[in-house]
């Protein structure tokens, strides 16, 4: 009997696609730096110019699923951050970074198609 082959990083990444907008936004936030949950929510609100405001249930439910899928990992609080000992920090994993790259490429292709087909009116 031959040994069971583990899926490659690329296979694991492709199995996560397509992403929900919430997962995409969290990965984008963590691609810049490690953050705690409320920092992720604030960053997303800032880079979407208020267009996306994540409530605690959506944010932490999605974070839990992303931890289970190994897209992100939790960290100890950085030295000097004693604001709240319960605060958990998160970091994007190599798998999460590859998923973000693949989803960005997929969405760029869709946007390119929309432009070529003039799917929307320009001012």
Question: What residue spans do the PLM features occupy?
Answer:
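Beta-hairpin "wing" of winged helix-turn-helix
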Residues: 67-85, 91
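Amphipathic alpha-helical dimerization/coiled-coil segments
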Residues: 3, 95-123
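A detector for short, charged/polar N-terminal pre-domain segments
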Residues: 2-20
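N-terminal helix-turn-helix DNA-binding core of bacterial DNA-binding proteins
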Residues: 14-58
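The N-cap/first-turn positions of alpha helices
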Residues: 20-23, 86, 96
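Basic amphipathic alpha-helical segments that dock to polyanions
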Residues: 59-66
């Amino acid at each position: 009997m031959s040994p069971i082959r583990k899926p490659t990083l690329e296979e694991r990444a492709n199995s996560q696609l397509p992403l929900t907008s919430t997962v995409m936004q969290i990965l984008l936030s963590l691609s810049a730096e490690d953050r705690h949950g409320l920092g992720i929510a604030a960053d997303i609100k800032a880079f979407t110019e208020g267009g996306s405001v994540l409530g605690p249930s959506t944010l932490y439910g999605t974070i839990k699923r992303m931890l289970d899928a190994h897209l992100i990992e939790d960290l100890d609080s950085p030295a000097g951050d004693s604001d709240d000992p319960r605060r958990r920090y998160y970091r994007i994993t190599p798998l999460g970074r590859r998923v973000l790259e693949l989803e960005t490429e997929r969405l760029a292709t869709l946007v390119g198609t929309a432009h070529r087909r003039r799917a929307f009116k320009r001012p």
